[in-house]
A protein has these predicted regions:
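Phosphate/pyrophosphate-binding active-site segments
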Residues: 157-160, 198, 319-320, 324-421, ...
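A structural motif corresponding to the C-terminal end of an alpha-helix
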Residues: 149, 403-411, 542-547
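Glycine-rich beta-strand-to-loop/alpha-helix junction loops that act as flexible
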Residues: 236-239, 303, 420-421, 472-475
């Protein structure tokens, strides 16, 4: 057997560089690169190995570990989980800075490989700089924090362990059902330790993403339920986009059987916004058409959806409809006593359609779906078409969204909007028009503030030919903005629109909706410090990080600035002041947020009555 004598870190990087996959029919590297922030825990071992393979496996430098992980996650999401990236950090704070991002990937079922440095296996210099000492278990390090938010975790305490750990890691990262973050903790001394590895271990490999076929019996049961339905609705989740050919299969199924399609946050863009069977967004952030149809349906066909509370209205939206859940993951397919069909979305929809033959939804239901959907599109057009406001009135997010899309004639097909948290996810879910799969990039599983700008970098790396528009509130911007400098450094140009409502406007409105007084969310409601402070010049801040930037004060000025931003050669930030109170009133659904059972406040007591009414509507 021919062997190669390599350090553990050299073998690791060489193996990753040898992994390939198919993307749009082309063979490409499975790992597009490694994000790295070096410290004493990884610079000598992993850092040396990355330098040796810098051409085959590019290394990217960031300014914050959580942010670079979010960029990696967004890259994988933009590639519909068919390609991915790795992230390496030092031990201690570098490693734990990844934990929030690991949870983001875990919730969203997105692949990313974490390679944090770890403490010495030998324990000779124990405790080392930044080591977290556990008083009860000598084997615990900071990296044990990854275990609850990793789909697979391994600590490599001997170089030979890579021979089993790496194939397991690849298997999890590319498994459609188990897909999620993988963590390989790399002790500092073992990174540098040499071993005679079999040369065959590093042979180029083509990793194929499986498309599990559905069980015939499950298909028969689902088909029987559908044939008995008169008022069905499809709920398209992220699994439709992650399935190769899933969006096309969804369209063909809907057209063949005349079933309206509602989209979750993760599934939005699976069907073009103007398709006749597009009912629009569903759930708490949904529109009136999809929610009306979902509430009145006698059967819900959920395809690739986690059926989270925002999709189901905390399980109050679907009424008494039967639920058929198509999902590659049994954990998701069996939720809420659904009739489960385990399988890839594209394969399952095609097989289910073949069993249904000429069946279609009832004619009265088809007509109702068309009426509701047409009415919703008219509502959206009225909101996003607003160009002039009274001089004393600030714009709100819906009007800003309209301005963004008006500044490119093919925005629905050309732009990719990126967002994650705050007021914007609800407004974008309702109002953004996407004509191609992937044109709507919303991280709304973990809804992690700070994902937006870093995520935009990952999306731009995946799709350099498209305009990536990051829409972010002032709250999320202040959480994590350092990667503006990274985008300038890497040449990954973004158009960033900052909507400044001077605080956490979304949670302020929720606070008021549950009966409480405004408190500690908007700057004006903070009880500590001088009222109204601080006064933040976001445009000046963005310029200091290397971007082009300007502040505008009207929708007309915003459109002009966005034209300049689209024509610019580097990241361009446009800031506009927005109303923290106004939102799109059309649509929406009840969302369970616990309201105090007893309170001295009459408004809280009134909110409790509304809460109890919502509880009575929940499915049991």
């Amino acid at each position: 057997m021919t062997t190669l004598r390599l350090t553990m870190a050299q073998a690791l990087i060489r193996f990753l560089a040898a992994q390939g996959t198919l993307c749009d029919g082309r063979e490409v590297p499975l790992f597009a690169g490694v994000w790295a922030i070096f410290g004493h825990g990884n610079v000598a071992g992993v850092g040396e190995a990355l330098y040796r393979h810098r051409d085959a496996l590019p290394t990217y430098r960031a300014h914050n570990e959580q942010a670079m992980a979010h960029a990696a996650i967004a890259f994988a999401k933009a590639h519909f989980r068919r390609r991915m990236m790795a992230c390496t950090t030092s031990i201690g704070p570098g490693a734990t800075n990844l934990i929030t991002a690991a949870a983001t990937a875990h919730v969203n079922r997105l692949p990313v490989l974490f390679l944090p440095g770890d403490v010495f296996v030998s324990r000779a210099p124990d405790p080392v700089l930044q080591q977290v000492e556990d008083f009860h278990d000598g084997g615990i390090s900071a990296n044990d924090c990854f275990k609850p938010v990793s789909r697979y975790f391994d600590r490599i305490i001997a170089p030979s362990q890579l021979l089993t750990a790496l194939p397991r890691a690849i298997a999890v990262l590319t498994d459609p059902a188990q897909c999620g973050p993988v963590t390989l903790a790399l002790p500092q001394d073992v990174q540098a330790e040499a071993y005679d590895y079999p040369e065959a271990f590093f042979a180029p490999a083509l990793v194929r993403i499986r498309a599990p076929l559905p069980d015939p019996v499950e298909l028969d049961i689902a088909a029987q339920l559908l044939r008995a339905a008169k008022q069905p609705v499809i709920v398209a989740g992220g699994g439709v986009l992650y399935s190769d050919g899933g969006a096309e299969a969804l369209r063909e199924f809907a057209e063949a059987h005349r079933v309206p399609v509602a989209e979750t946050q993760a599934g939005k863009s699976a069907l073009p916004w103007d398709h006749p069977l597009q009912a629009g967004p569903i759930g708490v952030t949904g529109g009136t058409a999809a929610n009306t149809l979902a509430h009145d349906a006698d059967l819900v066909l959920a395809v690739g959806s986690r059926l989270s509370d925002f999709t189901t209205g905390s399980h109050s939206l679907f009424g008494q409809a039967k639920i058929v859940a198509v999902n590659v993951n049994n954990f998701d397919a069996q939720k809420w006593r659904a009739t489960a069909v385990h399988g890839d979305a594209a394969a399952t929809l095609a097989a289910l359609s073949a069993r249904l033959g000429g069946w279609s939804a009832g004619m009265a239901w088809q007509e109702k779906a068309k009426r509701e959907s047409d009415k919703w599109r008219t509502t959206v057009s009225g909101i996003v078409g607003v160009r002039e406001l009274e001089p004393s009135r600030l714009p709100y997010d819906g009007e800003v969204i309209g301005a963004v899309q008006r500044t490119h004639p093919q925005s629905a097909a050309h732009d990719i909007v990126v967002c994650a948290a705050g007021t914007l996810p609800a407004e974008l879910h309702k109002l953004w028009r996407a004509a191609r799969p992937g044109g709507y990039h919303m991280e709304y599983g973990y809804s992690c503030m700070g994902y937006e700008i870093a995520g935009g970098i990952g999306v731009k790396m995946a799709h350099p030919e498209r305009e990536v528009v990051v829409m972010v509130g002032d709250g999320s911007y202040l959480m994590l903005n350092s990667e503006i400098a990274t985008s300038v450094m890497l040449g990954t140009k973004l158009v960033i629109v900052v909507l400044d409502n001077r605080g956490y406007g979304c949670i302020h409105r929720l606070q008021r909706a549950v009966g409480s007084e405004g408190f500690n969310n908007l700057f004006d409601d903070c009880v500590q410090g001088e009222p109204g402070m601080p006064a933040i010049d976001f445009a000046a801040h963005a310029r200091a990080l290397g971007a082009l930037a300007e502040h505008v004060s009207s929708i007309a000025d915003l459109e002009a600035a966005l034209a300049r931003a689209r024509a610019a050669d580097r990241t361009y930030v446009v800031v506009i002041d927005t109303d923290p109170l106004r939102t799109t009133e059309a649509g929406g659904w009840w969302w369970e947020v616990g309201v105090p059972e007893v309170s001295e406040s009459s408004s809280v007591r009134a909110a409790r009555i509304e809460y109890e009414h919502g509880k009575r509507l929940q499915r049991q």
